[in-house]
């Protein structure tokens, strides 16, 4: 779908150029350069500010990254970094050139360390490495998403589909860690007290126009839909 969006964008730009509007196609066709710059700058930021996960530094986490890459049949193990989270629970995967990497905010990384829940950390690492294995971090995929974001709802829908795919990779890699997703709902200290199944059940009861709208405009599936997809492996996640 990203390839289709990219091709339509390029064809649209060329069409506008032939119709006598030179400014808009030039702006659109400059997006690849912007995406390249942003990817390079983001990668450099992790390298100079983050803590590299290696066999000697955070060896348990490094082993998780290596095992996830092997489980997904990846030819190269991606780099991995811990970055200062300042209270934000987040992680992401990206790349620059031929290099691929994952970055985990320190607040999320602590779940597997100081809070002693390695299953949860293994699941999150599986999710991020899954993004790379699924091709979500390629230059043209991210370019396609950038173009799709111009159309309200389209880019975010592609993003949600990718998140479900990465969740599927994480579940295949380490299903025992699925309960760690509660961190996304209540944070790193309260999540052990959260009832996972209650959030799953609310996917059926908490519905309506505004719930659909919130999900439509979100780059990630809302928690109720996402938890429900992880609980019922026989159904695909709800994108819309």
Summary of predicted features, one role per range:
Residues 128-145, 175:
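Catalytic Zn2+-binding segment of zinc metalloproteases
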Residues 56-63, 67-77, 152-205, 232-235:
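Short helix/loop segments within enzyme catalytic domains
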Residues 65, 104, 127, 166, ...:
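Divalent metal-coordination and catalytic microenvironments
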Residues 112, 125-133, 165, 169:
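Active-site His/Glu-centered metal-binding helix of metallohydrolases
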Residues 204-240:
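Pan-zinc metallopeptidase signature
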Residues 107-123:
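Short pre-active-site segment immediately N-terminal to the catalytic Zn-binding motif
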Residues 1-88, 152, 240:
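Hydrophobic or amphipathic, alpha-helical segments that drive membrane association/targeting
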Residues 83-101:
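Catalytic zinc-binding patch centered on the HExxH motif and its immediate surroundings
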